[in-house]
């Protein structure tokens, strides 16, 4: 069976080179006589895997020496609790609400202290990024929190907020490693792996060392303390070992491609092909303010729910999977992460053009 073009928002498409390498090593990883799935996380072989993964990630992002890299479990959603549990000193966090995931993080923070919504784009169904140049940042805020790329709604910050000296915390799950990032502008970054760098089950945290504290909220469980994992180099307990191994292979794939500058150019080209078609189409239209469009997640609609459903059905039959929009918004969404080949986007646009011609002719 031939592989489909998988436009899933996550778990998502992975580089074929990585999958083939993993398949070749499945039964015998580099002469160990066992799979990485079977390997002790305390073994020398696995120590090399996790150390190389961290080193390659540091190289890709030019992560400063005063930041720790953690490979954790619990997904990005667990970070919604870990962030306030570990960073609250005054018990106050300022949140910019640009979609469901930022909203969920905001609601979770309320369980542990005060969460302030200092800006929101909910008034227009999260179809834009609010002005973040002069936010009413709370004087006692411990941090300012953003979700930098909004998977469901297809928006992306092009300018980071002026936090007025407060720590910036960012969920980068659906744009992680899609382009260069200046890590030094953030106090803490986290990203679920299953969108752009690996399988579900791994969350990557990049945290400035001074934010790894002993004096966290007293009810914080041992496993939810960043210090626990930083001190143990992500090996306090059994990590998601195979997932980290795949992430490591993706990091090497990105380096071989030329790094994040090269990846950004490819992503911009893919996104332009799809957005250019949407802008000239008479049937399909994008749902996001143009200046805030994501390179990774492209939502679109026809304006007719029945026609949307027909498009999803016919596209699936043609080998394009997971184009149905999120259940909360409907329509369609093409997630064109790093591993989606240019050819996949070109073929999708060709299919969309044919669909439009066919159904416009039928309507006439």
Specify the residue positions occupied by each region the protein language model found:
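PLP-dependent enzyme catalytic core of the Aspartate aminotransferase-like
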Residues: 2-4, 317, 326, 330-364
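PLP-dependent aminotransferase-like
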Residues: 77-142
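Conserved N-terminal alpha-helix of the aminotransferase class I/II PLP-enzyme fold
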Residues: 33-79, 86, 100, 108
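Active-site C-terminal subdomain of aminotransferase-like
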Residues: 15, 193-275, 289, 361
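Conserved PLP-binding catalytic core of the aspartate aminotransferase-like
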Residues: 284-315
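Active-site phosphate-binding strand-loop segment of PLP-dependent enzymes
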Residues: 10, 109, 120-176
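Conserved active-site segment immediately N-terminal to the catalytic lysine
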Residues: 169, 183-194, 203
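A glycine-/small-polar-enriched, mobile loop at the entrance of the PLP active site in fold-type I
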Residues: 3-54
